[in-house]
């Protein structure tokens, strides 16, 4: 992560309830921030050097393709993200048991947000039905 403040803005746009619940300096003097709620958080710290090649998700290279989070209202989240200028990267999808939206943060990391339309785990986690 090159821009910790940018990541914090992205996460607080997606999750308005997120706050910096702790921060400090690591042994090498670099800043770290825990952003989230009292129950869960994401640990952020800056990269020490610029990578030789900018990583892009879904290209078969080492790295995280995307992180996914369950939300109660994916359309409200989508409106917040677009209003804040984040790029929608949602692939076509029309699953009967979930709504998914994807957004790139300012560093090109892809984040998935899913609203489940069923309480049944088998239906929620079905990957055989085609997304149209």
Residue ranges and their predicted role:
Residues 38-42, 48-51, 74:
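Short, charged/polar surface micro-motifs in flexible loops or helix N-caps
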């Amino acid at each position: 992560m090159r821009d910790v403040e940018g990541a914090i803005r992205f996460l607080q746009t997606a999750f308005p309830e997120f706050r910096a619940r702790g921060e400090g300096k690591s042994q090498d003097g670099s800043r770290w921030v825990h952003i989230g709620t009292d129950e869960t958080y994401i640990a952020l710290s800056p990269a020490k050097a610029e990578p030789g090649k900018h990583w892009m998700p879904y290209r078969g290279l080492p790295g995280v393709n995307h992180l996914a989070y369950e939300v109660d209202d994916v359309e409200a989240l989508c409106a917040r993200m677009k209003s804040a200028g984040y790029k929608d990267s949602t692939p076509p999808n029309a699953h009967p048991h979930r709504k998914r939206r994807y957004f790139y943060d300012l560093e090109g990391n892809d984040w998935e947000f899913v609203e489940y339309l069923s309480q049944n785990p088998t239906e929620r986690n079905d990957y055989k039905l085609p997304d149209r």
